[in-house]
């Protein structure tokens, strides 16, 4: 993150104020204040790790992935017992994205589920939508297969299996 000295001074003052306003986080803000004041380049990257830009088409893709998982789950519920036995229910769970390499996507999913209240049926589990493995390519293949199905919200067990195996 490149900042002028004036910007660093302003940010340092903001961290100082935050340390005074929230005593429970004082150590965190003092640390950040020191990083900014002294200009430690490696640690300065921490400051902008949560700032990013997720373009509109990427947001729409994520919503499509989540909607596809919703359709998979609802279709599974409509299957008879014999058909349900052909699908492993845990595979229907929306896992999210890899926080290490797809952090913007993880944050967007959390925003949609926590702030916007969308997809309350999705289990956050202890990982909070951090799949711990890259998922973007897998979801894209699944989405393509799902879009080729004639009845996207009334899938058969074989269609569900095809989508999950994409």
UniProtKB/Swiss-Prot annotation:
Transmembrane segments: none
Cysteines paired by S-S bonds: none
Protein's organism: Photobacterium profundum (strain SS9)
Signal sequence extent: none
Protein known as: UPF0304 protein PBPRA2768
InterPro entries: UPF0304_YfbU, YfbU_alpha-helical_sf, YfbU_helix-hairpin_sf
Pfam families in UniProt: YfbU
Similarity-based family: Belongs to the UPF0304 family.
Origin: domain of life: Bacteria
